[in-house]
């Protein structure tokens, strides 16, 4: 009986983690004022990409953890507004 109860508790926690709690990520570009967005259901990471061009260092923030081209730095994280 104790084993069944423990299994039920673990399954409940896992299901709540999958369904609950959308991530909030910063989504401002370069030197713009801070803005945030609530990510789509199931998206649990934020990213910050940065690169240099003729305008200087540029940055982009958002939800997820995209692949990047060579020369672009990417940082991914998994707490709210961790990509500021």
Swiss-Prot record:
Gene Ontology MF annotations: acetylcholine receptor inhibitor activity; ion channel regulator activity; toxin activity
Primary location class: secreted
UniProt KW keywords: Acetylcholine receptor inhibiting toxin, Disulfide bond, Ion channel impairing toxin, Neurotoxin, Postsynaptic neurotoxin, Secreted, Signal, Toxin
PROSITE patterns tied to this protein: SNAKE_TOXIN (PS00272)
Regions crossing the membrane: none
Gene Ontology cellular component list: extracellular region
InterPro entries: Snake_3FTx, Snake_toxin-like_sf, Snake_toxin_con_site, Toxin_cobra-type
Keyword Disulfide bond: yes
Disulfide bond positions: 25-46, 39-63, 65-76, 77-82
Biological role: Binds to muscle nicotinic acetylcholine receptor (nAChR) and inhibit acetylcholine from binding to the receptor, thereby impairing neuromuscular transmission.
Assigned protein family: Belongs to the three-finger toxin family. Short-chain subfamily. Type I alpha-neurotoxin sub-subfamily.
The protein's name: Short neurotoxin SNTX-1
Organism whose genome encodes this protein: Demansia vestigiata
């Amino acid at each position: 009986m104790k084993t069944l109860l423990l299994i039920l508790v673990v399954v409940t926690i896992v299901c709540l983690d999958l369904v609950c709690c959308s991530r909030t990520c910063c989504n401002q570009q370069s030197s713009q004022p801070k803005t945030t967005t609530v990510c789509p259901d199931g998206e649990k990471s934020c990213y910050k990409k940065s690169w240099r061009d003729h305008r200087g260092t540029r940055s982009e923030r958002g939800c997820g953890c995209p692949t990047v081209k060579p020369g672009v730095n990417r940082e991914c994280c998994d707490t709210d507004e961790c990509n500021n």
